[in-house]
Design a protein with these regions (language model features):
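Surface-exposed, active-site-proximal loop segments in enzymatic domains
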Residues: 86-91
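Basic, often amphipathic N-terminal segments
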Residues: 1-74, 94-161, 169, 173-186
């Protein structure tokens, strides 16, 4: 694999959800791209964020100030849902996640969510993304949704606390690692 040059490495802001015991086997089985790249279970706040090379002390201070002004909250993953080719768990209360995402997008308007492809993103925790490989082995999104309901459903609702936002940074090998965490309400 070719090493990614530093000026091409990306960052992302996420709410990491300590749900590995619930979702990692499912993510592994369905070859979730983020799972394969070292990204923990999460709800995306803003991706892509700033290029990694531009995230220095000043940007980190801005992020810390922004997130410290937002209140932490209790949350749950409550149900299995789907987009076109993605299967995900719905985080609730939805409005708190929408507000967190909207406030962050408003504070950093140069970095629209999903590069502008989805200007009003639906909060979600992806557990499977179907691809050409999925079609070759006979999986349809409906079958994966049903499998998710059977496998993951008994673990729902899954309670967690949203008290920080994590900055992930893409590495030269294409994998992602936690760069730092910003506490909410500090």
């Amino acid at each position: 694999m070719t090493e990614l040059p530093p000026d091409e490495r990306r960052t992302a802001l996420i709410v990491a959800v300590r749900a590995e015991a619930l979702v990692d086997d499912f993510r592994r089985r369905h070859r979730d791209f983020a799972f394969e790249r070292g990204v923990p279970p999460h709800v995306t706040v803003l991706c892509p964020f700033a290029p990694a090379a531009s995230v220095g002390d000043g940007m980190r201070a801005e992020l810390a100030a922004h997130f410290s002004g937002l209140a932490p909250f209790a949350a749950e993953l409550t149900e299995v849902a789907q987009f076109d080719v993605a299967v995900w768990l719905a985080p609730r209360p939805r409005d708190r996640f929408v507000d967190l995402i909207a406030a962050t997008c408003a504070r950093f308007p140069d970095y629209p969510p999903y590069g502008g492809e989805f200007p009003e993103p639906e909060p979600h925790l992806t557990v499977a993304e179907l691809s050409d490989r999925s079609e070759k082995i006979g999986d349809s999104v409906e079958r994966v949704v049903e499998r998710a309901r059977v496998v993951l459903g008994p673990g729902l609702p899954f309670a967690f606390r949203v008290d920080a936002v994590t900055l992930l940074e893409e590495q030269g090998d294409g994998n992602w690692r936690e760069s730092c965490r910003f506490g909410l309400g500090l």
